[in-house]
Amino acid sequence: MIVCTTISDLQAQLRIEREQKRSVGFVPTMGYLHEGHLSLVKRAKEEHDTVVMSIFVNPLQFGAGEDLDTYPRDFARDEQLAEAEGVDILFYPSTDEMYPRPASVRLKVTQGVDVLCGASRPGHFDGVVTVVLKLFHLVEPDAAYFGLKDAQQVAVITNMVEDLNVGVQIVPCATVREVDGLAKSSRNVRLSEKERKEAPGLYQSLLAGREALDAGEKDAAVIRERIRQSLEERLTGRIDYVEVLSYPRLQKIERIEETVILAVAYQFENARLIDNLIVPYGE
């Protein structure tokens, strides 16, 4: 595995890959890798000759008072995991390397950001698409792989690629879970022992909503309330949101007559976790 810490080194290595006509799959991450990230690498390796992973904690997507400074980081650990999984090129830039001067251009997302995480994190997805587009320009991959645990991010990035005619295929990949159903997340390490025992209740509550939907309930408000009640019964932290939205348009709906996303965000003492289920219409 080749580790590149500068843009020039990355681009020099990628020129070699292109000269050899090798296809490139890209897995962008913020590090502190877990099985969810590694499952993206596995998928990329199945479909491409070369796999590039980036590890960069992007300051543009963190707002005031958010967890930029405390976001878990362990590059030595991440490097070992990436190499063991078969990553070919690991791009690990500093903030100064990615943003050597104050930005004169920043993308602004105008659709699908006033709900879910975007509602309480103004500017978050502007920062996400800005860094993702920059990484796409640097890596020029054939395809990029994203986990559906953050389905809103997948939708926003997909829309950005379509709107700007970016020549990168977006490959959404299923959420990877612990055996008890908790979605794999870098923030899980910040849960207390008690919170870790409660946390699978996020997924269980989503399943309760899915069960009501499967039983024939089409009123989105009823589904939301069923999920909320389940969360209140199972967990002792604070509900950030419970939503039932169209997907991938992320529009509020009253009746469920299309593919929807059931989504929750929950605030524990030192970690905010999100989870979701996408329910295709007719299933």
From Swiss-Prot:
Binding site for (R)-pantoate: 61, 153
Subcellular location: Cytoplasm
Top enzyme category: ligase
Binding site for beta-alanine: 61
Pathway: Cofactor biosynthesis; (R)-pantothenate biosynthesis; (R)-pantothenate from (R)-pantoate and beta-alanine: step 1/1
Binding residues for ATP: 30-37, 147-150, 176, 184-187
Keyword Metal-binding: no
Keyword Signal in annotation: no
First-listed, main subcellular location of the protein, grouped into a coarse class: cytoplasm
Catalytic reaction equation(s): (R)-pantoate + beta-alanine + ATP = (R)-pantothenate + AMP + diphosphate + H(+)
Keywords: ATP-binding, Cytoplasm, Ligase, Nucleotide-binding, Pantothenate biosynthesis
SUPFAM superfamilies to which the protein is assigned, alphabetical: Nucleotidylyl transferase
Cellular component terms (Gene Ontology): cytosol
GO molecular function (one): pantoate-beta-alanine ligase activity
Protein EC: 6.3.2.1
GO terms of biological process kind: pantothenate biosynthetic process
Active site: 37
Note: The reaction proceeds by a bi uni uni bi ping pong mechanism.
Role of this protein: Catalyzes the condensation of pantoate with beta-alanine in an ATP-dependent reaction via a pantoyl-adenylate intermediate.
UniProt subunit comment: Homodimer.
Entry's family note: Belongs to the pantothenate synthetase family.
Name of this protein: Pantothenate synthetase
